[in-house]
Amino acid sequence: DYMKYDAVCVGNHDIETGHNVYDRVRRQMKTPWLAANAVREDNGKSYFQDYVIIKRKGLKIAVIGAENANIAAWLTPELWSGMRFVPIVSMMQAKVDEVRAKHSPDIVIVATHTATGKGDGSVLEAEGLDLFKSLKGVDFLLCAHDHRPFVTVNEEHTFGFINSGSHCRNIGHGHLAIEVKDGKVVSKTVSTDLIPVK
């Protein structure tokens, strides 16, 4: 809340603190905790919030979050009891489509706590490039977890990937140039870079 973030993406270090801590802190914070793939065992709904809709300068921005899907392999079950973690690649396109249909956002950001990976679908904790290759209707994909600074954009410059690394060494920066005609977004061009923190 102090940093005035619009939302935060749940990461493995949040879950490591256990239910007593993260459930209490989440209730105390105004900032939404996002993790659409952390699913409750009792009712199949998300344990955390799936997404947030933000309005800025006449634009509607959707931020959809996801936790690392490999949590159960690292942490003892009592830390995450009552939920399971769905692979992000298997669920995110449907969530993007749902949010687009329900809210008609001008901008869609997918914020994840998954590593960059190689894009070959082989590592559950590293779904970043797998998502980048497969997602449609997304403007920016934010990744983390592996502490590996990496940015890229697709050939059309309509989809950007940002992993700022770790330890506040970089600020991941995404720039989106938007053309609006008759009140509607008609074109978007993205760029990404890392700004070193000195």
Predicted segments, located by residue:
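Acidic, metal/ion-coordinating pockets
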Residues: 1-197
